Amino acid sequence: MTNLRKTHPLMKIINNSFIDLPAPSNISSWWNFGSLLGVCLIVQILTGLFLAMHYTSDTMTAFSSVTHICRDVNYGWLIRYLHANGASMFFICLFLHVGRGLYYGSYMFLETWNIGVLLLFAVMATAFMGYVLPWGQMSFWGATVITNLLSAIPYIGSDLVEWIWGGFSVDKATLTRFFAFHFILPFIIAALAGVHLLFLHETGSNNPSGLCSDADKIPFHPYYTIKDILGILLFILILTSLVLFSPDLLGDPDNYTPANPLNTPPHIKPEWYFLFAYAILRSIPNKLGGVLALVLSILVLAFIPFLHTSKQRSMMFRPFSQCLFWILVADLLTLTWIGGQPVEHPFIIIGQLASILYFLLILVLMPITSLLENNLLKW
């Protein structure tokens, strides 16, 4: 009699995805972030569900309902901070996952990569709307500033903004619809992640060398299940340490002040994981130009497979490309720092230079360097 996990229609899918899946024998810990992102999504959906049971999406009561969760609900403070810091962990894992894909040439799996870019946009949209829900000062003004950017779109801009707001300013209608979208999007993300995996399993995983690994495959279970569990344990350790010791480390103190449309905070800034894109937005004096640069800062990832000029897939054996990759990482950290600084000298010029370098590296320098390395192979 054949094993049930190999014959049962549902078990068969699980078996082919997580048990008998042939995986390259040499994939490093950088391949752990896919499973960690799955854990992040599960943590966010569960904590979010319990928060939604006590939250009210009304401008009059939203702030006090969050306070009520933290003070009166059993372990409400824990659920709230797990959700808030879980979002930060989500983005740390996302950035590392994308970075891994860039370094090792995983973007050559076109469908998987494009759905990944779509997932990144969806997670960013979800996080932005979630930040609006506590209805603190930074929630309100962040929502006002970012949604107002759509007014830069020619002809339909101002109508589009009023349509999204559900009125002439960010108000009750905006908060209610943001709550509805914030609730539904994670389930759409989960479905997209399933498609992401589906396309990945069509080709099989990439590996650090970037070479075909068909000749040397091992079963996913037990080798990579145990490896993923180790990653998950470390993830839980970091998340719980953050939640229990310094839950407000990555948040903004302004969000502990209830939203006041009559009082603008001195520095409006988003959560830390959007600061690099925010710095790129601010570095362009023109409003429409800034919005285009903001969108392109993420959308540029979709162009990367077409800018791959190297004969080798991975950067493992390409020292010049490695240098440029780490310059790109440093540049993104610089942009993140600049995004949190006030708009004044010398931060303006640093932000503009870092923004130019960001696009220059991805669109020009990396493809040219790859061509140079191809010629070096002939020596």
From Swiss-Prot:
Binds 2 heme b groups non-covalently. It holds the Pfam family Cytochrome_B. Its cofactor is heme b. Keywords: Electron transport, Heme, Iron, Membrane, Metal-binding, Mitochondrion, Mitochondrion inner membrane, Respiratory chain, Transmembrane, Transmembrane helix, Transport, Ubiquinone. It is a multi-pass membrane protein. The cytochrome bc1 complex contains 11 subunits: 3 respiratory subunits (MT-CYB, CYC1 and UQCRFS1), 2 core proteins (UQCRC1 and UQCRC2) and 6 low-molecular weight proteins (UQCRH/QCR6, UQCRB/QCR7, UQCRQ/QCR8, UQCR10/QCR9, UQCR11/QCR10 and a cleavage product of UQCRFS1). This cytochrome bc1 complex then forms a dimer. This is Cytochrome b. The gene is MT-CYB.
